[in-house]
């Protein structure tokens, strides 16, 4: 008898089973829905990408994304994650299906999964339909940026645009503006601040803080807290750390701009509580300072320098301050006003103050008097000591170190607007004792260059190329004002350089004079006596003196520096020179001195002696008695490096640097002397063949001139075969210190491939050498392709080279090249340039003679190169380049 099985099922259970199997068909349509979900999700991601691109473009234009767009993007991101999770288990879920996908082995599990897929598909479809935005952004609400009052400016428009654009770059979080006092940094900064009001609410808050010198962190925190409405009594009683926490808490959720005006040292943002600007938070910190060094400490290693105004802009500003009423009162006043404006050298502070002072002066005589005061003692000009010099003096005070301050004041001894030769300036400093007691010239000079860098970064001096610096005229007046004890001791520094004097100026109290500079005048004779018992520096260079009276120097026992250079007719030193017992620096270069006085041997402290281009000096006999001598220059002197001279020089045991001319027979130099040579001139060697490989032993050689000599090539080091003489270790250059090279009238030389081993060349001049066909020969440099020449070259001068066809066989980078001069080189048709060769093309010039009459006279690497450098070709003119004729600057 068969058995029977009976099961009772409730209606609710039957309904649930029915819904699983039939109601929504989640299982039956699972595979179809999965395929649809994948397609719809791909479409959604594409739409999402388009929307994000639109948002990015609009936000770059300082628009703000719509809230609905942000909500949609958030939902898409959430759905995308959910979809990836669902699809990751698809293979497992499909394995559960049976009956051709109409049913499942695990009905409830498949039902739940199918339902999730169906609902997600509907959500994705909905998002796809909602993603068609007509607008994704809107103008931001205007943030509350209170405009700062500013005066109309002239000549700062380009600088404002450049500074604003740089600050708004995504990769720039910190930006510094640096420049000398009174140059207009704060005015420019205010205009940048006010532009934030123009662009609306791109930033949540813009904070302006005047920092000034010596400000404490607590004061900065208080100023910032007031802007953030934090500064109540409870907050004021907190310590700096807690205040920083509060400031950070408020700012970290905001897109802020912090503008710090007039900082003198690094501002510790973290200690204040400022979140560090980044590409993520898109915040900005901007500041002004007088110090480039501070810019680096703050994290801006490419700060923007605010410079003085160009002459025409300066004149416009000055005219505005003086006013049309005064300028039109007499036609002569306009010309006199131009002269006064020029005295300000483009410094807005001076232009504003002096322009306002002169605005009521309607008589020609008043303007003539003003010019006279400027020329004789500018510090006495009305308002100069009240409104201009004290502002500039802050930079001087910030130097701190008294030696650096002395170095700065020393620069005021040079003429207005005159370029100062760095190395000679530092040698003066060394002898004056400003640099310390280091007896090693190289170390002392290195320290001097560090001090020079400090003055340059403080914007008290301006760098001019590699070899020179210059002091702004108004800064110079400030230095002279300080040196005179603020006008109380005007004869501390007697400075009348480059003013056309024909005689020594009258001095009331010679005993008060510490420094005297009468350089660059027309003084022919000194007839007065002086009792300069305190004088330490006497500059008489570049006059028309024929001698120096003994009576004039009799009382100068403290004189340390005496410069008589460039008195072309000067032929005799008095025997009273022996009384200058403190003398350390004596420069007689470019004079007609015929012999050294017997009393010279009494100068026991003399350490620097320059006899460059003393072409009438026949002997330096007795120089070996100058036992303290550390530097001797004989380049271009009639005294050449013959056996008798070298014998004397070998006795100078403290000698550290030698500049000398070698001619006639090649003398085998003492090894110690060879290492001391820094500047060498070789002339009149007509041997054939001639080998200058001995130069490689001169490890301190910085300047080399070869003239009227006969040799085919310079061998850097001995090698196994003639053909491989350049195949040496390129990591050990032969001429590491060589920075200046002149080759003149060397008619056997065909190339200068050996200069590959002079990686620090700054100046290269090749002149009147008829066989030179290329500068660097490709075949000889075959194994040296890893060496890139001319990376530090600033001046390339090629004169009268009839066979020259090539400088280098392919384009080269010239990172710092300023000028390329090519004259009478008819076969040179292509320069080693491409479109990326020179980074600062706006500062680069090519001078060619004869000038190319048509564009196709020169061959270019490509059209981009041609278009980039054609504007750089300028009319030919004669220059005196640094390094030409060595130290004749």
From Swiss-Prot:
Residue span(s) of domain NB-ARC: 137-440
- For the ligand (ATP), the binding residues are 179-186
BP GO terms, sorted: defense response
LRR repeat segments? 510-532, 533-555, 557-580, 581-603, 604-625, 626-652, 653-676, 698-721, 825-848
Q: What does this protein do?
A: Involved in disease resistance via the salicylic acid (SA) signaling pathway. Involved in shoot architecture development via the cytokinin signaling pathway.
PANTHER family in the cross-refs: NB-ARC DOMAIN-CONTAINING PROTEIN, NB-ARC DOMAIN-CONTAINING PROTEIN-RELATED
The protein's name is Disease resistance protein UNI
Q: Which gene encodes it?
A: UNI
